[in-house]
Amino acid sequence: CLKDLPQGTRVGTASLRRKAILLNKRPDLDVDIIRGNVQTRLGKLAAGEFDATFLALAGLDRLGQRDVATEILSPEDFLPACAQGAVGITCRADDERTLAFLSALDDAPTRQTVMCERAMLDALDGSCQTPIAGLAEIYGDQMRLRGLIARLDGSEVLHTDVTGAIADAET
């Protein structure tokens, strides 16, 4: 378990967001960025380059390797990246046939939550180099947005938790 890792444990993650959150929760750990696909990162773990690593459960599931996970972290403890797990499809604006086909694939609640999370990301001028997390969820006619922005070293993490009308979710 994360809480039981000894001081100085070398932890690898591919995410600046996860690194900042982890350092904020456990500044006694040695957290570093690890590059490569899931197999490469597992190889680095097996080779002793790291004592532990963070991996997306979806990636482990795709590879049939869920069994290597020793702990599944909750979004309450580690908020995901904005729009993480959502798939977006684009096409030419004047291609009415394709637009009609794609409209059947649109999931309005997912689109609404993604747009809310991305609005927060835009308001914070976020990029892949900024430790920002966001998770929007719909409850009836309301949307709740939990978010955070952190210093890269984890020394400071600012949280927000707001609820409002879905119609206002992008403002």
State where each predicted segment sits.
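Small-molecule-sensing regulatory modules
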Residues: 24-171
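A conserved helix-loop-strand patch within extracytoplasmic ligand-binding domains
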Residues: 1-29
